[in-house]
A protein has these predicted regions:
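Non-heme Fe(II)-dependent double-stranded beta-helix
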Residues: 1-13, 18-112, 117-120, 238, ...
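Short, solvent-exposed loop/turn segments at secondary-structure junctions
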Residues: 23-24, 100-102, 117, 136, ...
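Non-heme Fe(II)/2-oxoglutarate
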Residues: 40-52, 155-161, 196-201, 205-268
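Short, charged/polar surface micro-motifs in flexible loops or helix N-caps
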Residues: 79, 89, 104-106, 136-138, ...
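Active-site region of the double-stranded beta-helix
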Residues: 90, 116, 131-142, 148-150
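A short beta-loop-beta micro-motif enriched in histidine and acidic residues
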Residues: 114-126, 187, 194, 218-220
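Short, conserved beta-strand element in jelly-roll/cupin
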Residues: 120-138, 193-196, 201, 226-229
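Double-stranded beta-helix
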Residues: 138-207
Length: 268
């Protein structure tokens, strides 16, 4: 149940943790889907840690295009309603899905970044629902957020997650993100201990990152489902990533299309 205080916290801080938003059945379905993807990775899979640190920081995206369980999570789980409520939007269109698995003993961090500068979309009503599939704390890579940073009014240059990917973002004329870790006391950094089925809902402009997984045996599997709301518009500007399937949208158009389906409200 989303409360008024949850919505107010999201608006103020840019992030909120919702407890047990996904029941045990959803957790088990998604864990099984993750293991299938790890065993037979999709065409967009990568190991973000490759070339920098030992371990495996597995990432994949667009799994909903070929896996029915990821598709069900994106379109039919509690996530669309959560996203619409938090965005204060009358509608929600599914944007894309992204999987992050930090295996034990993987020191590679998730760099501090905002999401929206990577994406060919503009607007305020853009959010992610990040579902925990394992117990998570800071030792195995809890996501950290700078509360209120979604309202700083600055777009930072996209930061590559993997060594050697810097060239992808050289077209961006945005300013580099500050060195947050050089003086963490300057910022209101938030993170949550999470249980499987908890989710984080966070604004596309909030500055966030995560440490590595320093544990010997605690995995950190997280599925992020991205949604856009009423005011979002397609914006394929230079320096953003391109989708593997080009959306049938003109620049400035609302996001709804076959690639970004309307998921809230549910069709009658």
């Amino acid at each position: 149940m989303i409360t008024h205080s949850d919505v107010a916290a999201y608006d103020r801080d840019g992030v909120v943790c919702l407890r047990q938003a996904f029941d045990a059945a959803w957790v088990e379905r998604l864990r099984a889907a993750v293991e299938r993807d790890l065993a037979a990775p999709g065409p967009h899979a990568t190991n973000f840690a490759e070339g920098s640190t030992p371990g495996r920081f597995f990432g994949d995206m667009y799994m909903w295009r070929y896996d029915p369980e990821f598709r069900a999570a994106a379109l039919d789980s509690p996530a669309p309603a959560i996203a619409a409520r938090m965005m204060d939007s009358g509608s929600a269109d599914f944007f894309y899905d992204q999987l992050f698995v930090k295996e034990p003993g993987t020191a590679h961090p998730t760099p501090w970044h905002q999401d929206q500068p990577y994406w060919p979309v503009k607007g305020w009503q853009i959010t992610s629902v990040w579902i925990a599939l394992d117990p998570i704390d800071r030792s195995n890579g809890a996501v950290e957020f700078i509360a209120g940073s979604h309202r700083w009014g600055v777009n930072y240059r996209p930061t590559p997650f993997r060594k050697g990917h810097e060239i992808k973002f050289t077209d961006s004329d945005l300013v580099p993100i500050p060195d947050i870790d050089a003086d963490r006391t300057k910022y209101d950094i938030r993170w949550w201990k999470m249980a499987p089925g908890d989710c984080l809902v966070f604004h596309a402009m909030i500055v966030h990152g995560a440490p590595g997984n320093d544990t010997a045996g605690a995995r950190r599997r997280g599925l992020s489902l991205r949604y856009t709301g009423d005011d979002a518009r397609y914006d394929p500007r230079p320096g953003t990533f391109q989708f593997p399937h080009k959306p049938d949208l003109a620049a400035g158009a609302p996001m709804t299309c076959d690639l970004f389906p309307r998921v809230w409200p549910k069709a009658a």
